[in-house]
């Protein structure tokens, strides 16, 4: 692998792409450390040392590479774009106009991309306003004595400037991602997520060691590393697993030449839904805790939520989280893969699955296979998401932010595999032996 990587750097055009990607990453990380105007950076650092960021806040903190709680110009990171993309993907299923655009090919896709950018800016304004309002009230950091002093000047003018600064930081992140896609290596919208998550690993690992109680925290530290390696191996194995549905294409005569008559396949991944169900479940479970946090209510319902759904080690939380992941896995697969559309396209070009009639029987067969492989895929997602929480709960540290969580591992492995495959294809074009053997 290292020899292949060295050969990649010896190839002029590939080396140029790799160095360009690294340069964009450096710019992105610099922006993630420039504080927004009106923020007392020393107070922020003091509160970060005492912070417990979990749930949706922890998810956004992870996607921003630690920039969210530091309230920097790139504090929102790529999260508004991810949210906008998911919303547009869901709306495409229920709004006929968007569905028609999707079928128009490249021009329709460009229009949907334009809508996604507009929605990204709107969500950035909304999320930036929420972040600044939370920081002004002192609720951004729990149990921090100077939390209300992070934003010293609480005037409307300062608030507007902070919101505009963080909103203005979102389009450059999208632009940097598009530059990576066009002139670099990898998916430009995935690389910032990859770097942001990887940037949180060293600090999170050391925090686990510092908060550990067994052998000065080294046992907890070693356990987390071991669990991380096992999870990475499991995720790589499952993410590569797929059910291949054989498809036979008919032979066509054009002039005197024969075309087609070959066999291909439809790849159905075991984890067809990707990381989306985990994000949905985390976001939904964080809403009750958010309501309690801002209501400051001492009623019975608020106490029950505080006891059962704020920390991740309670059986109610674990069971609900697992059920939500399984539900959203089936839900997202149902809206992202349309067996009827696939069957119609196959019938249009004369393709068929051996032993299955074209048309409706093909769609029913694809639905049957997809439902069968989604079950193990959804259970796998639930396992990956819950193993870190349950492992840390065993050591009494369930409130500690776990660096090898399900979402982070799925994104790290997925983006890593995609990037390595792209480098592999570039090397094979030049007759070099690549990473994958």
Curated annotation (Swiss-Prot):
One of its GO terms (cellular component) is plasma membrane. It is found in: Cell membrane. GO terms for biological process: intracellular protein transmembrane transport; protein targeting; protein transport by the Sec complex. The keyword Cell membrane applies. Its main location: membrane. It is a multi-pass membrane protein. Keywords: Cell membrane, Membrane, Protein transport, Translocation, Transmembrane, Transmembrane helix, Transport. The chain crosses the membrane at residues 19-39, 68-88, 121-141, 156-176, 188-208, 218-238, 274-294, 317-337, 378-398, 400-420. The keyword NAD does not apply. Component of the Sec protein translocase complex. Heterotrimer consisting of SecY, SecE and SecG subunits. The heterotrimers can form oligomers, although 1 heterotrimer is thought to be able to translocate proteins. Interacts with the ribosome. Interacts with SecDF, and other proteins may be involved. Interacts with SecA. PANTHER family: SECY/SEC61-ALPHA FAMILY MEMBER. Belongs to the SecY/SEC61-alpha family. The central subunit of the protein translocation channel SecYEG. Consists of two halves formed by TMs 1-5 and 6-10. These two domains form a lateral gate at the front which open onto the bilayer between TMs 2 and 7, and are clamped together by SecE at the back. The channel is closed by both a pore ring composed of hydrophobic SecY resides and a short helix (helix 2A) on the extracellular side of the membrane which forms a plug. The plug probably moves laterally to allow the channel to open. The ring and the pore may move independently. This is Protein translocase subunit SecY. It comes from Streptomyces griseus. The gene is secY.
